[in-house]
Amino acid sequence: MESLKNNGEKIENFLNQLKNLQSNVDKDFKEFSNSPNTLNAEKDGEFLDKHDEELYNKQIIRSRLEDKISNLSSSMINDIGNDFQTGFQTILYNLPGVGPVFQMIFNIMGNGINLEKFYQEIITQVEQMIKKSLEDYYKNQCNTIFKNLGKACDQHKDLTQKWYDKNGIKSMNHLGKEIPQSTSSTIESDDTLTPMIHASYLDLKIKFNDAITSFTDAKYRGHVAPLLTYTSVMYVAFLRDILKYGKEMKFDDSVLNGSANTPGIKKMLNDFVNVTLSEFLISGREYTNVVNSLQEGYWITYPPPIYKVWVPPQQASWVSPPASELAHKFFLAHSDNYPQGGDLIYIKKDGVYELSPNKITHALEVYYSSGGGYGVNDYPSFRYGGKPIIPLLAPVGNAVFTMLNPNRYKRTFKIRIVHVIVREAKWNLDCYDNQVGEAGSFNQNFVFTSTNIVSDPICGNIGTVGITEIPGPFTTDKKYIRLTCIRKVNFPASKNEGYAVGSRILSVQLIDL
């Protein structure tokens, strides 16, 4: 922890910067809340645009400083933070693909749980394990921040629930059961509700930023990592719902999609997921280092309390794509390709993706396994934080992607591949019931050689990539759908055949038509 102590002055300067930014945002927020023009959508948009730019800059300042003080992680055990990542993934795996997820999250956290008591239980458990009391000032500060966050979440949940009820949008709890609609006798009009939701959005974003900044404070980050986990999950769910329903709630387009000066919720959500996964690695290692240095025993003797609070009583069998695709999942949540209800995708233990019978975009990110092969369900620790896949270098085998079509559901689909291809890539599609080449199997070869250069929504930090669509349409009722990227090693250099060193396959998507 010595490297963190040496940065005390930098941390203090950083917190002062945050304080100044915070006071400016608070001032703008008060002016906005007291303005007689809050019903004006254009006025809302201008203010929200300014607010999001300042808040995003605040997050960027913090993340840059965290990069400077996180070099101690290289000296610690590489996989020690996996329990925090697993907890974060488990929570988000069980989010329903439809309906407002913030309602579900806060129904677990807020309603029925005293947030102050919940916080005290976490701190007490930490202090018992490390046999040391945390400073009262810091404990009280965290308690106040967490309690204020809970109140703001409760207010936002109530306001948005009224809007959902008025617009006939059903909410589900963490077990997939429908939450009864509000019994309130007074349902405000959209003209009344939407400005209140806009103001609540601004207030809650500030509260989330305060909490996340506090829980990643370098001095105590290793002690309060569970609070960072809970807060981050609520924040992701909060942003996801505004992204999904924001247009209908009359949010300005710049808030959702960004503008020249504002990142927008899409980018904020994508960046936050990447930063958070990296942050959990740091927090988890420091947390473990603190516990193991001050008590007898090992990490396994102190499983994070996240498992006692968040995991649903019944294990969900249908889950979303891998955690590093969460941002992409949420982007699709408001598109025509996302299912209107029912199951999503089930990941079998052998790495096969079982496709839902509902219409959906099945996006499979490609991972490089630490075992030396390519697959779609490997989670090497270095993959988190937005790093791109290792280039496909010769000589390697063909890249194979197998998906299970449950109950031989007849489906028609097209294929989209996100990639960086040097030369060309030849693909083979075959659909079968038992063995490749069996009687009645459907085979089709196709080649793509050109790309449209755009920013990739999954791994946006790698620069530009190609997105190639093979329109098909492809139709099958077979049990297995398999895509094979054929790698030719010994082709003549003069022929433009086969992909060369420097190529990357980032994702393979089956899009039901």
Swiss-Prot record:
Gene3D superfamilies: Pesticidal crystal protein, N-terminal domain. One of its GO terms (molecular function) is toxin activity. Induction: Stimulation by changing levels of cAMP via the cell surface cAMP receptor. Signal peptide: none annotated. Keywords: cAMP. SUPFAM superfamilies: delta-Endotoxin (insectocide), N-terminal domain (SSF56849). To D.discoideum protein M3L. This is cAMP-regulated M3R protein. It comes from Dictyostelium discoideum (Social amoeba).
